[in-house]
């Protein structure tokens, strides 16, 4: 049985629009060829289901290199958390505990 993904893939324009909102936003900067990114994806889907007041999105760094450079993403996965239009934290690597901690501290 497959689980439907709940983390929506966005482009740079959609990410910028989402960042301007007042909800906590978690963006997963990923690559399709990245093994740790693939293993983290179902965990992020689960977190999205658990935290309905938090917006989860993902951005393919190969398709949106300019956006990845803007946010200084040099390793995948990198998750950046935004609130009220500002970057408030990031986690580099498939560190599920670190991501959960950052969400709980800011939700």
Swiss-Prot record:
Active-site residue list: 34 (nucleophile), 37 (nucleophile)
Q: Can you name the source organism? A: Echinococcus granulosus
Query: What gene is it encoded by?
Result: TRX
Any keyword ATP-binding?
Answer: no
The record's disulfide annotation reads: 34-37
Query: What Pfam families does the record point to?
Result: Thioredoxin
**Keywords, in A-Z order:** Disulfide bond, Electron transport, Redox-active center, Transport
Site (described: Contributes to redox potential value) = 35-36
**CDD domains with a match to the protein in the record:** TRX_family (cd02947)
Return the protein name: Thioredoxin
Q: Which family does it belong to?
A: Belongs to the thioredoxin family.
| Span of domain Thioredoxin | 2-107
Q: What residues correspond to the site Deprotonates C-terminal active site Cys?
A: 28
GO MF annotations for this entry?
protein-disulfide reductase activity
């Amino acid at each position: 049985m497959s689980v439907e993904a709940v983390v929506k893939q966005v482009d740079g324009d959609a990410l910028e629009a989402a960042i301007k909102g007042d909800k906590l936003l978690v963006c997963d900067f990923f690559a399709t060829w990245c093994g740790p990114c693939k293993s983290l994806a179902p965990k992020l889907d689960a977190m999205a289901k658990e935290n309905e007041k938090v917006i989860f999105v993902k951005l393919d760094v190969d398709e949106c290199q300019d956006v990845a450079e803007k946010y200084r993403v040099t390793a995948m996965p990198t998750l950046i958390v935004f609130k009220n239009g500002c970057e408030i934290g990031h986690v580099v690597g498939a560190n599920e505990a670190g991501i959960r901690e950052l969400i709980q501290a800011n939700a």
